[in-house]
Amino acid sequence: MNQYNVKYLAKILCIKTEIARDPYAVINRNVLLRYTTDIQYNDLVTLITVRHKIDSMKTVFQVFNESSINYTPVDDDYGEPIIITSYLQKGHNKFPVNFLYIDVVISDLFPSFVRLNTTETNIVNSVLQTGDGKKTLRLPKMLETEIVVKILYRPNIPLKIVRFFRNNMITGVEIADRSVISVAD
C-alpha cells in the first residue's frame, strides 16, 4: 500500500459510499463530483474520510494491508475494514493491489452501471423465458470478484443482475445486462 494506491482506492470508496446512500443509484465517474475525500496515510492503517458535498454525510473507511489487520470501529465508520490484498479474492471489502495501479474510476473505460431492483429483475427474467417455458435464455456472466460487483455490494440486498449502459452514436444509449455468479472457495 502506498499513497498513490490509496488515492485511487479513495475514488472507488466514494462510489461505495454512493451505493450505501442509494443502492439503486446509476454509477459512473461523475459520482466523484459529489464527494470530497480526506486521506490520512499510514503504513499500518490508512483512514479515508468520504464526505458528501451537499448533505455533509461522512463515512470513514479504514484501509489495511492483508498482513496487518487490526480493525476497531471509529465514529462514522463504514462498518468493515477495507483490505488491500496481493491477489484477487472473494469479498466486497478486499481489493487486489493490481486494481489500484492506475486510476480506474476516472478512466474513459470505466463503465456506467446500476443494480436492478426486484421489478426490473423479474422483467428481465420473463423476457429470457422461451416459448415453451421449460428453457430459458441466459445472460452473460460476471464473477463476484469483479470491481463492479464489489462496488454494488449491500449486505441486505442480493445482487443478481447488473445493467451496463454504453453510448452509441447511432442508437443513443445501449443497455447490456449481466448476471452475477459466485466464485467457489
Swiss-Prot record:
Described function: Part of the DNA-dependent RNA polymerase which catalyzes the transcription of viral DNA into RNA using the four ribonucleoside triphosphates as substrates. Responsible for the transcription of early, intermediate and late genes. DNA-dependent RNA polymerase associates with the early transcription factor (ETF), itself composed of OPG118 and OPG133, thereby allowing the early genes transcription. Late transcription, and probably also intermediate transcription, require newly synthesized RNA polymerase.
Gene Ontology CC terms, in alphabetical order: DNA-directed RNA polymerase complex; virion component
Subcellular location: Virion
Catalysed reactions, as listed in the record: RNA(n) + a ribonucleoside 5'-triphosphate = RNA(n+1) + diphosphate
Subunit description: The DNA-dependent RNA polymerase used for intermediate and late genes expression consists of eight subunits Rpo30/OPG66, Rpo7/OPG90, Rpo22/OPG103, Rpo147/OPG105, Rpo18/OPG119, Rpo19/OPG131, Rpo132/OPG151 and Rpo35/OPG156. The same holoenzyme, with the addition of the transcription-specificity factor OPG109, is used for early gene expression.
Family designation: Belongs to the poxviridae DNA-directed RNA polymerase 22 kDa subunit family.
GO molecular function, one term: DNA binding
The enzyme's E.C. designation: 2.7.7.6
Keyword Nucleotide-binding: no
Class of this enzyme: transferase
Stored InterPro entries: RNA_Pol_22kDa_poxvir
This protein's name: DNA-directed RNA polymerase 22 kDa subunit
A Pfam match: Pox_RNA_Pol_22
Entry keywords, A to Z: DNA-directed RNA polymerase, Nucleotidyltransferase, Transcription, Transferase, Virion
